[in-house]
């Protein structure tokens, strides 16, 4: 089976304002979806830093509660909006993962209800394609308070600890909910799932 890490994070982002129209409706009340002014390569970038929780899903993790699998998460992102509807980003995400394994697990330690606890470091460096649904369906509005932004991406994931490690290609899917705090500051609630091969924690099968 595939191994999964579910992440929920709050991210604070500093943004560069778009140089498009500020309203999303014309004088007749119709939604405006373009055309948009083309900016230079250095325009419409943002940086974001945040924290949250990781929940690991492996072969034996259904043998313990979700609360026992909660671990801290850290996100750092650099992104660019190519248009108000489409953007890309490079993100580091990870920190820790916790769960249960059997004796074959690379990160097995203390016994727990017939299994072994595992806790290991994890990092995921990934590139994502973002689609701003709010701007796509409702038209660009610089002052919109809430934007819904699904994304998909791929990257390189690493687990390590106990003097061992594993590297895997990771697929990522998730959704961003951004809330406007000011002209150049957003607060984002992000939910994301990372999928890797089952050997990510050294346990195969099940």
Predicted regions span which residues?
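Short glycine/proline- and aromatic-enriched beta-strand/turn motifs that initiate or cap beta-hairpins
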Residues: 20-79
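Short loop/turn motifs that connect adjacent beta-strands in outer-membrane beta-barrel proteins
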Residues: 34-44, 85, 135-147, 181-184
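Residues that define the transmembrane beta-barrel architecture of outer-membrane proteins
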Residues: 43, 66-74, 121-125, 146, ...
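Residue-level detector of the transmembrane beta-barrel scaffold of outer-membrane proteins
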Residues: 46-48, 87-89, 147-151, 186-188
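Residues on the lipid-exposed face of transmembrane beta-strands in outer-membrane beta-barrel proteins
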Residues: 49-53, 76-80, 127-133, 152-156, ...
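Transmembrane beta-strands of outer-membrane beta-barrel pores
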Residues: 51-57, 92-98, 133-135, 154-160, ...
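Outer-membrane beta-barrel translocator domains and adjoining extracellular loop/strand segments
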Residues: 59-65, 100-109, 141-143, 161-171, ...
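Glycine- and aromatic-enriched membrane insertion/assembly motifs of diderm outer-membrane
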Residues: 65-128, 194
């Amino acid at each position: 089976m595939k191994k999964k890490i579910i992440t929920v994070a709050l991210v604070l982002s500093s943004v560069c304002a778009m140089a498009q129209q500020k309203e999303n409706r014309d004088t007749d009340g119709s939604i405006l979806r373009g055309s948009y002014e083309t900016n230079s390569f250095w325009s419409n970038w943002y940086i974001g830093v945040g924290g949250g929780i990781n929940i690991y899903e492996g072969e034996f993790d259904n043998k313990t509660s979700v609360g026992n699998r909660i671990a801290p998460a850290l996100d750092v992102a650099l992104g660019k909006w190519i248009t108000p509807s489409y953007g890309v980003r490079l993100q580091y995400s990870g920190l820790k993962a916790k769960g249960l394994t059997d004796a074959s697990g690379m990160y097995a330690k203390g016994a727990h209800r017939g299994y072994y606890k595992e806790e290991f470091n994890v990092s995921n460096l990934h590139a994502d394609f973002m689609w701003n649904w709010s701007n796509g369906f409702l038209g660009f509005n610089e002052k919109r308070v809430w934007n819904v932004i699904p994304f998909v991406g791929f990257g390189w994931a690493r687990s390590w600890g106990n003097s061992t490690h594993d590297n895997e290609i990771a697929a990522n899917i998730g959704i961003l909910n951004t809330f406007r705090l000011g002209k150049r500051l957003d607060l984002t609630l992000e939910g994301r799932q990372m999928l890797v091969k089952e050997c990510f924690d050294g346990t195969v099968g099940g």
